[in-house]
Curated annotation (Swiss-Prot):
GO molecular function list: 4 iron, 4 sulfur cluster binding; ATP binding; magnesium ion binding; sulfurtransferase activity; tRNA binding
Gene that produces this protein: ttcA
Highest classification ranks of the organism: Bacteria, Pseudomonadati, Pseudomonadota, Gammaproteobacteria, Enterobacterales
Additional observations: The thiolation reaction likely consists of two steps: a first activation step by ATP to form an adenylated intermediate of the target base of tRNA, and a second nucleophilic substitution step of the sulfur (S) atom supplied by the hydrosulfide attached to the Fe-S cluster.
Function text: Catalyzes the ATP-dependent 2-thiolation of cytidine in position 32 of tRNA, to form 2-thiocytidine (s(2)C32). The sulfur atoms are provided by the cysteine/cysteine desulfurase (IscS) system.
Protein name stated in the entry: tRNA-cytidine(32) 2-sulfurtransferase
Compartments where located: Cytoplasm
The keyword Nuclease belongs to this UniProt entry's keyword annotation: no
Protein EC: 2.8.1.-
Length: 311
């Protein structure tokens, strides 16, 4: 009996520690990019996957202690995919007492009509979904639209654009829609996918499969995802360093003439940021920038097991 209590206490401690880390990550992202302001009405896009469930849970948690007032409304788009369990999200949200709206639009039928069998449908589906969500945000009076993309998604997009698109372009934590009417935020921008996976499992969210449409997976993105996972295992700290690099750009040491006036460099010009690397090799730190050993690596005997609530 005592052993079972110790196990449960340890599991609760680990869950609280994980939730604190996710809260901290989300809080830092919100502060760094001014994602949420006083009086905001946040439309939380809920797909039924681990990421959007986690986003809603952490935002609800932060809402209770935030120094500003903001409201949340969860929105799910029922695209009429065969086998979609329509009852799951309403039951879950009603249990939480969260305001929500289920938008029913047969985008599945449109996509199946327009895209040949066996081809990836994600691009058209995404465009249709985006338009519907923007319209819904207007109807609900939402000032911000929250999406559940995390740090790994942002890095994957960076490498996809580098490898296949020839661009240094990632996925912004905050953006304005093309029509200038909607601000989109990604509160999980600093969160690791593996933390989200563990959190979703511990919370036992009622996950809805993402392959109901029968679309072929994005093989290019899968290749990039596998590459990053391999690097994370073989080279601890590399993922953290790459993400830090996205936040510390030195235009004078790249090759984009739109970002830096290389032609304007002449005798008497100011010294550019980044240092003079014309002759000397730059010294690289032995430990990856922005990386610290994971908290989960703490030896079990040093863990306090008396913390059972997130303060």
């Amino acid at each position: 009996m005592q052993d079972n209590q110790k196990v449960k206490k340890k599991e609760q401690y680990n869950l609280n520690k994980l939730q604190k880390r996710l809260r901290r990550n989300v809080g830092e992202a919100i502060a760094d990019f001014n994602m949420i302001e006083e009086g905001d009405r946040i439309m939380v896009c809920l797909s039924g996957g681990k990421d959007s469930y986690t986003m809603l849970e952490i935002l609800r948690n932060l809402q209770q202690s935030a120094p500003i007032n903001f409201s949340l409304v969860a929105v799910n788009l029922d695209q009429k995919q065969p086998g979609f369990p329509e009852h799951i999200l309403p039951a879950y949200l009603e249990q939480l007492g969260v305001e929500y709206k289920i938008v029913e639009e047969n985008t599945y039928g449109i996509v199946k009509e327009k895209i040949p069998e066996g081809k990836t449908t994600c691009s058209l589906c995404s465009r249709l979904r985006r338009g519907i969500l923007y319209r819904t945000a207007t109807e609900l009076g939402a000032t911000k639209i929250a999406l559940g993309h995390h740090r790994d998604d942002i890095l994957q997009t960076l490498f996809l654009n580098m490898f296949y698109g020839g661009k240094m372009k990632g996925m912004p934590p905050k953006l304005m829609s093309d029509d200038g009417k909607h601000i989109v935020i990604r509160p999980l921008a600093y969160c690791r996918e593996k933390d989200i996976v563990r959190f979703a499992e511990a919370k036992a969210f009622p996950i809805i499969p993402c392959n109901l449409c029968g679309s072929q997976p994005n093989l290019q993105r899968q290749v990039i995802a596998d590459m990053l996972r391999d690097w994370d295992k073989r080279y601890p700290g590399r993922i953290e360093t790459m993400f830090s690099a996205m936040q510390d750009i030195v235009p004078s040491h790249l090759c984009d003439t739109n970002l830096f006036d290389f032609k304007g460099i002449a005798h008497g010009s100011e010294v550019v940021d980044g240092g003079d690397l014309a002759f000397d090799r730059e010294e690289i730190p032995l430990q990856p920038a922005g990386w610290q050993p994971e908290e989960d690596d703490t030896p079990l005997e040093t863990l306090r097991l008396d913390v059972i609530e997130v303060k």
